[in-house]
Amino acid sequence: MNIHEYQAKALLKSFGAPVAEGVAIFSADEAEAAAKQLPGPLYVVKSQIHAGGRGKGKFKELGPDAKGGVRLAFSIDEVKSHVAEMLGNTLVTNQTGPAGKQVNRLYIEDGADIERELYLSLLVDRAVGQVAFVVSTEGGMDIETVAHDTPEKIISVAIDPEAGVTAANLEALTAALLLEGEAKADAEKLFPILYKAFVEKDMALLEVNPLIVMKNGRMRVLDAKMSFDGNALFRHEDVVALRDKTEEDAKEIEASKYDLAYVALDGNIGCMVNGAGLAMATMDIIKLYGAEPANFLDVGGGATKEKVTAAFKIITADPAVKGILVNIFGGIMKCDVIAEGVLAAVKDVGLTVPLVVRLEGTNVELGKKIINESGLNVISADDLDDAAQKIVAAVKAA
């Protein structure tokens, strides 16, 4: 689960991290009052969407020369002008896809005199089984380019969970970021705070980009992105309360009601598979034969007929889907249950696109018999390779 920047900063502030003063607004009428709460004279107006690249993004409704999703303002009138342009419009960034995201809230923040922009994040390093700091002296809007072109500029420091952030860890991090004086002292206070917040709130990612050194030598968290482990949310009602469902895909929200692992993608072949590994292999082979998957959908090992029906409905709710591939290897999952669920869904929602079904495993013959005797236009496949070729061909021919 993700939250907005202003929410992430409020959470970090509660742990003692240095963040700028700011006010979130939801309508243009709130702009002037919000700006008056800040010291000024420099203000920053920030679009609040669950995607990065906001500064370089463009609004669909504005011209190509219009400013992006993060703007500087040097007066309250300029704040109001930016708010009027940004709020309610659609911001397209390198992370939103061409559809973009509607900006329904803005964060007006006190400006800062920036001397240096650094990058910092915390994540779970699965290679070592520990939380790791990832830092770079090259912070800001071009961090993806830095990671691609000069990966040696990105340093990782793993933290022993028993010891926590040690003096040696702090020395390694501050040295990697070339910090000294007050900035180094601030960092030595800040980094344990960030680690504590990450662990206590069961985060999957905490990204501060940029982490700045101001001209007065002090440090500040200028931007913050947080993602939380969905499996641990039951322990954090305060975090769940921050969820903004308008930023999430409606199909993913519906899937979560049935404990289905669903991720919307940009292709046109819907997939329903049992098992994450098989689901990824299914997506790979669709791409191998020249098409693109419309989703990742793992129905799990203990799916019921009702769960399968719900999964099918979620797939067909996507107007981009031009064909569906059902790929089931029945172990715990029984092929006849899948077959009954698919047929029930087809009868319920109708079938206007090609459907290929590949079944293997427990009760496979019964499952195939149910499908073959249904009288519905369902294409049967012998194996995964055969299934992928058939669905790609059917979609191209449609």
UniProtKB/Swiss-Prot annotation:
Its cofactor is Mg(2+). Pathway: Carbohydrate metabolism; tricarboxylic acid cycle; succinate from succinyl-CoA (ligase route): step 1/1. Mg(2+) binds at N209, D223. Disulfide bonds: none annotated. Binds 1 Mg(2+) ion per subunit. Succinyl-CoA synthetase functions in the citric acid cycle (TCA), coupling the hydrolysis of succinyl-CoA to the synthesis of either ATP or GTP and thus represents the only step of substrate-level phosphorylation in the TCA. The beta subunit provides nucleotide specificity of the enzyme and binds the substrate succinate, while the binding sites for coenzyme A and phosphate are found in the alpha subunit. Belongs to the succinate/malate CoA ligase beta subunit family. HAMAP family: Succ_CoA_beta. This is Succinate--CoA ligase [ADP-forming] subunit beta. The lineage of its organism: Bacteria, Pseudomonadati, Pseudomonadota, Alphaproteobacteria, Hyphomicrobiales. The gene is sucC.
